[in-house]
Curated annotation (Swiss-Prot):
Domain of life: Bacteria
Protein task: Bacteriocin active against species of Gram-positive bacterial genera Bacillus, Enterococcus, Lactobacillus, Lactococcus, Micrococcus, Staphylococcus and Streptococcus. Active against L.monocytogenes (MIC=0.53 mg/ml). Has no activity against various Gram-negative species. Has no activity against strains of fungi C.albicans and A.brasiliensis.
GO biological process, one term: defense response to bacterium
Temperature impact on function: Thermostable. Retains 100% activity after incubaction at 100 degrees Celsius for 30 minutes. Retains 70% activity after incubation at 121 degrees Celsius at high pressure for 30 minutes.
Keywords: Antibiotic, Antimicrobial, Bacteriocin, Secreted
Subcellular location: Secreted
Misc. remarks from the entry: Antibacterial activity is lost upon treatment with pronase E and partially with trypsin but not when treated with lysozyme or proteinase K.
Secreted among keywords: yes
Chief location category: secreted
Activity versus pH, per record: Stable from pH 2 to 12.
Name of protein: Bacteriocin licheniocin 50.2
Amino acid sequence: WEEYNIIXQLGNKGQ
């Protein structure tokens, strides 16, 4: 899903 993709990217930036 596109939404899930964004969440994943945000999580990566958080780390």
